[in-house]
């Protein structure tokens, strides 16, 4: 498994043509692992972002007003694609799989956004966040997706998910709502011609215990690949740093919730 882990912005230059994927926090590529199978695109690997090893505040750059009094991000990770050109009417397509070990009132969330060349938001394509029942897209307190999803309803596949990017949280679950979505297809029609960036992200909400992640694959525009691959390897120990502290603080959190 290749990882990119940092507490500041890093650029992974992917070719001699100055194309770049930018990462905040912890991201990488991986093959079939735990509950995350190979993507339906047939690719031998997929990209991922995880709150494990995430950067402080590394979530959406704004607080969604419907989330329990407006409490915001604590830590998280984002990955932004290389800049790509698109014409009005072009179809943006990708696949994602949201995985979480945190539930109940502390549910984390993942998302994808379409940004312009200056990184201004054009569309919040989807958000995924656990809720007591029904589709977790959108989750509680979240806006409706701008992208069309297949399947349209996305319930959580419950249980304590095992997945390496979750670090020490893999195989654990805080109360109800843990699990994964399985692979979901997203499609979005570009409104105006221009240059764009595709962003994937995941964040811890309210605290930093019990991690979540987002796998993604098959990012294309009008059928042409969008570069989202990270290529700068970081030893696994780097993104597992602090695991013992996480276990200790997780125990404190469980006690405080009792």
Where is each model-derived feature located?
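Short, charged juxtamembrane terminal tails flanking transmembrane helices
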Residues: 255-258
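Aromatic (Trp/Tyr/Phe) and Gly/Pro-enriched flexible surface segments
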Residues: 21-229
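Short helix-onset patch at the extreme N-terminus, typifying the N->h transition
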Residues: 6-9, 25-27
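Sec-dependent signal peptide recognition
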Residues: 2-8, 237-239
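N-terminal signal peptide c-region/cleavage motif recognized by signal peptidases
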Residues: 13-17
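Serine/threonine-rich, low-complexity intrinsically disordered segments
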Residues: 5, 230-233
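A short, hydrophobic C-terminal helix/tail in secreted or cell-surface proteins
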Residues: 233-252
């Amino acid at each position: 498994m290749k990882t990119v882990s940092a507490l500041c912005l890093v650029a992974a230059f992917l070719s001699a043509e100055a194309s770049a994927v930018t990462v905040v926090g912890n991201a990488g590529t991986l093959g079939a692992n735990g509950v995350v199978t190979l993507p339906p695109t047939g690719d031998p690997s997929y990209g991922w972002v995880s709150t494990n090893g995430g950067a402080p505040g590394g979530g959406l750059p704004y607080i969604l007003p419907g989330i329990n009094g407006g409490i915001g991000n604590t830590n998280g990770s984002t990955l932004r694609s290389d800049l790509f050109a698109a014409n009005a009417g072009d179809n943006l397509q990708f696949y994602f799989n949201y995985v979480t070990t945190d539930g109940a009132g502390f549910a984390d969330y993942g998302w994808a956004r379409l940004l312009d060349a200056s990184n201004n938001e054009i569309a919040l394509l989807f958000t995924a966040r656990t809720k007591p029942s029904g589709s977790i897209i959108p989750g509680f307190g979240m806006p409706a997706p701008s992208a069309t999803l297949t399947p349209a309803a996305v319930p959580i596949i419950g249980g304590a998910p095992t997945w390496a990017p979750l670090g020490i949280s893999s195989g654990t679950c805080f109360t109800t709502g843990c699990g994964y979505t399985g692979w979901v297809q997203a499609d979005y029609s570009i409104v105006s011609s221009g240059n764009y960036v595709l962003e994937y992200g995941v964040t811890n909400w309210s605290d930093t215990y019990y991690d979540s992640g987002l796998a993604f694959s098959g990012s294309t525009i009008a059928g042409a690949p969008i570069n989202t691959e990270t290529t700068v390897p970081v030893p696994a120990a780097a993104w597992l740093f602090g695991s013992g502290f996480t276990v200790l603080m997780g125990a404190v959190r469980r006690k405080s919730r009792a």
